[in-house]
Regions:
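Bacterial N-terminal signal peptides that target proteins for export
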Residues: 1-8
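C-terminal segment of classical bacterial N-terminal signal peptides
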Residues: 14-22
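A contiguous strand-loop segment
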Residues: 23-137, 157-288
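Short, well-ordered beta-strand elements within core beta-sheets of diverse protein domains
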Residues: 141-147
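Short, well-structured alpha-helical segments that form the helix of a local strand-helix-strand
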Residues: 154-163, 297-301
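Accessory, solvent-exposed terminal regions and/or long lumenal/extracellular loops of proteins
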Residues: 262-317, 321-326, 415, 421-432
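Substrate-recognition/cap regions that form aromatic- and gly/pro-loop-enriched pockets
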Residues: 312-436
């Protein structure tokens, strides 16, 4: 199981004198009134390893003759319904430890991103231990997203699974549809809490529980029946500000690994708040100083605190955990667009590998296929793979960000700006097709558009990598006289 592998590496790294920035995800959510375009956003960087291929694929709708029993690598087993809906997913290429369908849309326009790992505290684990063969990140999307029609249904399905099978890990996840977004924390073996995302707020989510006062009587809350009773009975119940605090009760004490991402992300979007690095209890929900744009979230997922004294690009800050980590295997931003037909759902902006020198490309939720480079399953480097190509560009770019990476990042930013500017016209076209010709015509358009845009970006990335390798080879052992310029011939 991946969590066991990560825990072992963290222990080794800590014993060696510090935890690296190698291991876990960072999430982000925002309500529709917090964003500039009125879209709800759920987003995450999937972080584990700098050499871990991911596949972007579409699972077709399936109707089986009888229910099937699903069993994963750690022994979690569950009977699944006969009918599974079509869904998109970004899964592991090598699946000996699990599928890890990390994010996607289903045919009902429901989007799910799972998970951000988090650890229960010692008292919580003693009172309600994690279940070795319970629900884990490896399988959660696979056994939930194809079987739900709303975000609330998704939360309720997870709650039922944790009630009956238990959880193998502490996890944080997000589910959204055209009406609402939900934020959920699986806090221990059988305890959990989920809340609707406030429409006027955002949250930056490191590997740390953050839920505060959970009003279990609210219709906007779904929680385990013993969420409060258990810690009261076992003596680890905690309050903050005179009310029950879920994260303080169930979680670990926050450390630098998580603190720096909360501090960095909240100050980037809410600089007027002047959030202190020494904050002992961080607020989950914040209000941004200005409406949050798609570009803001892209930059957040690339953020290495460059404008602070904790700039992770400096040698003296090598142990600081940035949000934009080199170990991101993919980074995604989902915009839930209420004007789109429900079956279209919204748009996922996907950057393969780490986002710093990669490019975000848009995909509608109703696509039926992806470009072949997204489906290359090689565990070892393969230049035909979208993941491996973008990872290669990132590796070389990070060797000298000023001379190699700066102009690549600028090139992709301009490329993304053009796509963003064109997106409203594409939204209008898919709505027109859906209304005039129906669901299949809209899906055909979405699939063709997604593949064409990805093909163009992949071709440009191939050229950039070839030029960059040539530039680096020519300048090996000496400082280049000027910075690398990608696709210079294109601009002549």
């Amino acid at each position: 199981m991946r969590k066991i592998y990560l825990t072992t590496l963290l222990v080794i790294a800590a014993a060696a004198g510090g935890v690296t920035d190698a291991f876990c995800c960072t999430g982000f959510v925002a309500g529709k009134d917090a964003t500039a375009d009125g879209c709800r956003i759920i987003a995450r960087t999937e972080d584990l390893s700098g050499a871990h291929n991911k596949i972007f694929k579409v699972y077709p709708r399936r109707k089986r003759k009888k229910p099937v029993v699903f069993t994963d690598a750690i022994g979690f087993s569950i009977e699944l319904p006969r009918l599974s809906y079509q869904y998109t997913a970004i899964c592991d290429a090598e699946q000996s430890e699990g599928i890890y369908d990390e994010v996607g849309f289903n045919e009902y326009g429901v989007a799910m991103s799972a998970t951000v790992s988090a650890s229960p505290g010692k008292a919580a684990q003693e009172a309600d231990p994690l279940v070795p063969n319970g629900l884990s990140e490896a399988s959660i999307t696979t056994v939930v997203l194809p079987y739900i029609t709303t975000a609330r249904e998704g939360i309720e399905r997870i709650a039922h699974i944790v009630d009956t099978h238990g959880a193998a890990e502490g996890n944080i996840l997000f589910i959204a549809d055209h009406k609402e977004s939900w934020y959920m924390e699986i806090l221990s073996g059988h305890q959990y809490a989920a809340v609707k995302v406030p429409e006027d707020s955002y949250a930056v989510v490191p590997n740390h529980f953050l839920l505060d006062n959970v009003d279990i009587s609210s219709k906007d809350v779904i929680a385990s029946k013993d969420l409060i009773n258990l810690p009261k009975a076992k003596g680890f119940y905690k309050e903050f500000g005179g009310a029950f605090h879920a994260a303080l009760t169930y979680g670990e004490e926050i450390g630098d690994y998580d603190c720096v991402r909360l501090w960095g992300g909240q100050n980037k979007l809410s600089p007027s708040e002047k959030v202190s690095y020494d904050t002992k209890v961080f607020s989950l929900w914040r209000k941004a100083d200005k409406k949050i744009t798609l570009e803001d979230v892209m930059e957040l997922q690339r953020y290495r605190y460059e404008d602070t004294d904790k700039n992770a690009n400096l040698a003296e800050n090598a142990c600081i955990r940035p949000i934009g980590a080199p170990t991101s295997m993919e980074c995604h931003i989902i915009q839930m667009k209420p004007e789109l037909p429900q079956s279209v759902g919204g748009v996922m902006w996907l950057a393969m590998a780490n986002a710093e020198h990669s490019v975000y490309l848009p995909f509608y939720g109703n696509i039926t296929d992806t470009l072949q480079p997204y489906k290359v399953e090689d565990v070892l480097y393969n230049p035909a793979s979208f993941y491996w190509l973008m990872r290669s560009i990132n590796i070389i770019s990070a060797l000298n960000r000023d001379m190699y990476g700066k102009n690549i990042r600028a090139y992709w930013k301009n490329y993304e700006q053009k796509l963003i500017q064109e997106q409203n016209a594409k939204d209008a076209e898919i709505i027109r097709l859906y209304e005039k010709k129906g669901k299949k015509a809209a899906a055909k358009y979405a699939t063709k558009l997604g593949c064409e845009q990805a093909a163009d970006a992949f071709e440009k990335a191939q050229t950039i990598y070839a030029e960059l390798m040539n530039f680096a080879a020519q300048n090996e052992g000496r400082m280049p006289r000027k910075a690398f310029e990608p696709l210079a011939a294109e601009r002549k």
